[in-house]
Every structure is written in structure tokens, then in C-alpha cells.
Design a protein with these regions (language model features):
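Macromolecular interaction modules
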Residues: 1-174
């Protein structure tokens, strides 16, 4: 059975639901491959029943883990990198093949990556979300990470991706 989780991004520090991971970070500057700390963002990763938020989230998803199907959120990460996107419907089958056969396995072999996982939204937008639990978010600017994002297949698939968002979260607060 695939793992299901609730994922939310806030512009304020949220309540700390029991059992959920809460991270502080920000959007990602793609030119410098660093986190934009101002304005700060908070991420909650909840594998239990989501707790209603006191204030609305900027983004909210209910997700079903696609690959690997049942791996829980690691507890020992030093950071989380989140990428979300939509894909052109006519390329969705190839997109899923690429992500499952090349991208996620490649990232799971990179030194410093604790877990690379991908999800499909049952609620929320964009439809696809990838979470990378890492030893440090500095990995995002390393030659290994950048090379993994420059394969011929990823360059082809990038043309069919839409609504991409990138976030980094460096500080776990719960």
C-alpha cells in the first residue's frame, strides 16, 4: 500500500501537529542554487491524519507516494528539498517512466541524499511532488546534484513540465 501524507507550505510558523515534521526554509533561487530566506516559509510533512490549520496554507497537498511506494519520511535529515510540477498530459507516461526508472534511482545513489521520493497529488496543485531528504541543502549546488539534472532524458522531459516550484527547508523545528 502506498504511503499517504499531507504536505503544506505556510508563510507563518504553523502549529506543530503531533508526529508531523515541521521545517523552516524558503523558495529556491535557481540562478545561485541557494535558499531565499526572506520571506521565510514553513513546511509540514504529516503521515497521520492532517490537523486543521489555524490559518490557510500557501500550498497544500494530499499525496500518494509513487516511488518508492511505502518509504516513510526519514527522521535524520539535515534538510528537505521540495520540487513540484505538472506535466503535459500527452507526455505523462514517459514522464513517469523517466522519474521512476532514471531520476529517483539516480538521486537515491547520490552521496548526501538520505531519501528521494515522488508523489502524486490526490488533492492540490501541481500534481507531482518530489521530496529529497538530504544531509544538507548545500547538496543542491554540488557537481553530483547538478549532473543528475543534466542527463539527456531529463533535458527532454523538462520541455514538458509546467508550473514548477522549488523550495529548500534547512531547519527542522519539530
Amino acid at each position: 500500500m502506498p504511503l499517504r501524507l499531507s504536505l503544506r507550505i505556510f508563510d507563518h510558523e504553523p502549529a506543530r501537529p503531533s508526529g508531523a515534521q515541521v521545517w523552516r526554509g524558503g523558495a529556491t533561487d535557481l540562478a545561485t542554487r541557494t535558499m531565499i530566506a526572506d520571506p521565510p516559509r514553513w513546511l509540514t510533512i504529516d503521515e497521520g491524519s492532517p490537523v486543521p490549520a489555524e490559518r490557510p496554507a500557501l500550498r497544500e497537498w494530499m499525496l500518494e507516494q509513487i516511488n518508492p511506494g511505502d518509504l516513510p519520511s526519514p527522521e535524520n535529515a539535515g534538510g528537505v528539498i521540495l520540487v513540484s510540477m505538472n506535466v503535459d498530459p500527452e507526455r505523462e507516461e514517459e514522464f513517469n517512466d523517466w522519474y521512476n526508472m532514471e531520476h529517483i534511482p539516480h538521486f537515491n545513489r547520490l552521496p548526501g541524499v538520505i531519501a528521494a521520493r515522488r508523489f502524486r497529488a490526490t488533492l492540490g496543485h501541481p500534481r507531482y511532488v518530489a521530496l529529497y531528504h538530504v544531509e544538507t541543502t548545500n547538496i543542491y549546488a554540488t557537481p553530483g546534484w547538478m549532473a543528475a539534472n543534466e542527463t539527456p532524458w531529463i533535458l527532454r522531459m523538462r520541455r514538458f513540465q509546467r508550473d514548477r516550484t522549488y523550495f529548500m527547508f534547512r531547519q527542522r523545528i519539530a
